[in-house]
């Protein structure tokens, strides 16, 4: 998604060279460069700290499993968004977390920040209205059940490749 108008005054942006940046959108009225705006979201590989199992969810009537994820609120740190989203969507408390990687997701104009969120398993999960179903998987089962060719699969597989299918060993 490319901005066409200034977010301050609404004037049509032009392309203008900026030293060491290349061509950047520019507002001739405000006389300011307008760098691209995008969303920021977090996705989490939720790991049971005792068993090493990974929680995957299904959402919005879709049959495929994905990672828990959500948008970062304005002014909110990504780490706080991880804790908030895990608590809101599945009712678990994050004991500790680990940053994994980021990747820009073009379809939603979103920078995705992936973390591993280690939790203590609750006997009953309290899923909210955003989650249809959730299930614990071994690392290998998680690889097999995550939505194929998705960013969630890319994050999960990269993480498991790094830790050798042993999520508790960092």
Placement of each model-derived feature along the sequence:
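Conserved N-terminal beta-strand and adjoining loop/helix that marks the start
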Residues: 11, 22-23, 28-54, 71
């Amino acid at each position: 998604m490319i901005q066409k108008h200034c977010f301050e005054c609404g004037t049509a942006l032009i392309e203008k060279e900026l030293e060491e940046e290349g061509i950047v959108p520019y507002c001739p009225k405000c006389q300011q460069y307008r760098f691209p705006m995008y969303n920021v979201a977090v996705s989490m590989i939720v790991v049971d700290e005792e068993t090493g199992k990974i929680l995957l969810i299904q959402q919005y009537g879709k049959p495929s499993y994905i990672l828990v994820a959500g948008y970062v609120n304005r002014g909110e740190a990504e780490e706080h968004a991880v804790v908030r989203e895990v608590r809101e969507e599945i009712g678990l408390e994050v004991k500790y977390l680990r940053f994994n990687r980021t990747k820009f997701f073009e379809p939603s104009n979103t920078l995705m920040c992936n973390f591993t969120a280690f939790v203590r398993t609750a006997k009953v999960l309290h899923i909210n209205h955003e989650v249809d179903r959730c299930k614990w998987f071994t690392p290998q089962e998680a690889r097999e059940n995550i939505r194929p060719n998705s960013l969630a699969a890319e994050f999960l597989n990269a993480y498991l490749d790094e830790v050798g299918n042993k999520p508790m060993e960092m």
